[in-house]
Amino acid sequence: MGKIIGIDLGTTNSCVAIMEGNSVKVIENSEGARTTPSIIAYMEDGEILVGAPAKRQSVTNPKNTLYAVKRLIGRRFEEKEVQKDIALMPYKIMKADNGDAWIEVRDQKLAPPQISAETLRKMKKTAEDYLGEPVTEAVITVPAYFNDSQRQATKDAGRIAGLEVKRIINEPTAAALAFGLDKAEKGDRKIAVYDLGGGTFDVSIIEIADVDGEMQFEVLSTNGDTFLGGEDFDQRIIDYIIAEFKKEQGVDLSKDVLALQRLKESAEKAKIELSSSQQTEINLPYITADASGPKHLDLKITRAKLEALVEELIERTIEPCRVAIKDAGVKVGEIDDVILVGGMTRMPKVQEKVKEFFGKDPRRDVNPDEAVAVGAAIQGQVLSGDRKDVLLLDVTPLSLGIETLGGVMTKMINKNTTIPTKHAQVYSTADDNQGAVTIKVFQGEREMAAGNKLLGEFNLEGIPPAPRGTPQIEVSFDIDANGILHVGAKDKATGKENRITIKANSGLSEAEIEKMVKDAEANAEEDHKLRELADARNQGDALVHSTKKALTEYGDKLEAAEKEKIEAALKDLEETLKSGSADKAAIEAKIEVVATASQKMGEKMYADMQAAQGAEAAAAGAAGAGATAGGASQQQDDVVDAEFKEVKKD
């Protein structure tokens, strides 16, 4: 059985780790970095770039470079968060036939799980390159506050990437695993994990207990905001720069897609720099132009200014902390450790706010970028049976229920219930002789069903005619360890039953996932073909260079017809290489023609080399014969006895 890898599929960056015995290895990607930007670029020639190469070309290709796709995964197009992103993103977010938010790139309509699968495939390849063997199984992390649709969509992304997702676990829980197994502190501890990433915010209160030598991680409560993160902080800086530039130059940069991409890059850099310095400068020459000529942007931003811009965003993270503490039934003073996860927690103001709320300094000995992937790798080792000393008890983040008479949300499983869990309840009909019931499943905390997220619906038919309130219909909810819901309804009189795994009435159908898996496999084949084509081009370029060099040296020794034949073949090969449409077979055929035409020249070069070597050998032989007569008598006299001394080391 192969190893189960741990993947942190982040909004901004992703990371992959593996357990080797009792030590963890965060794996470097092909660029040598331990984290990979979650950025995917679709090129004109069909090539798909992932990570740093995609990020590098984003300024010149903004409409086809996709970032922060995790904010759209498992979401409906109508959701207000999606509508907010439409106004901000340089790429086109569209409404899919099923009502989900999809993205249109180069006339292709792509689902967020399909795009995220590209990042997961890069993580899979990174692990395979390191291990030297195929990887087919993974534990993937999601924000604790992800709902059922978002978890399902993440699982689909794994499948499209060619991975069997053994478990979906919550990011703060994974970070707690990494922390708990890395630290030597004994006894029971309550920890708070404050996770502010690129696109999402989570807070979890977790109890780590030592039970008969087994470490038990029990999540007491979780809360968060799946649309609050570093991307929003960047946007505040971008808005500020746009406003300042408009004041100074009278030009609105918000309408210029290329300028916006440069601003995004600079805003992110400025934010990072201001975590360690008090002031930074944003300098963007030729940012735009008007009738008076090119315009340059030069702006100083202080840490105080940045903090003023994002103060309200940081404040928004505190309310979920209050709710999580209350739901866990603990007091702030009972928290032993505060763990910071996610790149945004490097910001001094964030650390200050966390300290102010929890009344203690957060721990600095957890890597905020890697802890989540490390925890996922530990859970992978537990699932593979290689680790027996860890038990993880996670919770469902939001209440689950069904719509009952009057549009009321009747809760079946309350938020922060430990999973896996089951619950069944008996309901009846609302009308006389009702022959069928529709079960509508919702997730959320509002009293009325319409205020919550509809996860799915199904019918139970064939109920025998009876007065209202007489039939007994048992509805059962079953949440698995991934936090994914399975619902059943059974008429107790007839035994008729209907069960479904909740697939949101949006989401990808089985057929769509299968098609995307096949497309991904075809893509891998296409990548292989592109690589072979690049190799053929390189071979052709090298042959052109070496043949031209040889022609310069030996051309005059060839007959005119031979020389012309080589030059014609070279010209033909060069034109084929310049043509963007030439395939591998065409290039290889032209290479063969050049090689055949150059055969005579190769023979002449070889003959010349042989002759040169023969002449050298003859000259050396003549010189040696002259020296032998006089040298023979001296031979013994010239031998010097070497004196060796033993050097003793003290």
Swiss-Prot record:
Induction: By stress conditions e.g. heat shock. InterPro entries: ATPase_NBD, Chaperone_DnaK, Heat_shock_70_CS, HSP70_C_sf, HSP70_peptide-bd_sf, Hsp_70_fam. The modification Phosphothreonine is found at residue 200. Keywords: ATP-binding, Chaperone, Nucleotide-binding, Phosphoprotein, Stress response. SUPFAM superfamilies: Actin-like ATPase domain (SSF53067), Heat shock protein 70kD (HSP70), C-terminal subdomain (SSF100934), Heat shock protein 70kD (HSP70), peptide-binding domain (SSF100920). Transmembrane segments: none annotated. GO terms for molecular function: ATP binding; ATP-dependent protein folding chaperone; unfolded protein binding. The keyword Iron-sulfur does not apply. Pfam families: HSP70. It comes from the Bacteria. CDD domains: ASKHA_NBD_HSP70_DnaK-like (cd10234). Acts as a chaperone. Belongs to the heat shock protein 70 family. This is Chaperone protein DnaK. The lineage of its organism: Bacteria, Pseudomonadati, Pseudomonadota, Betaproteobacteria, Burkholderiales. The gene is dnaK.
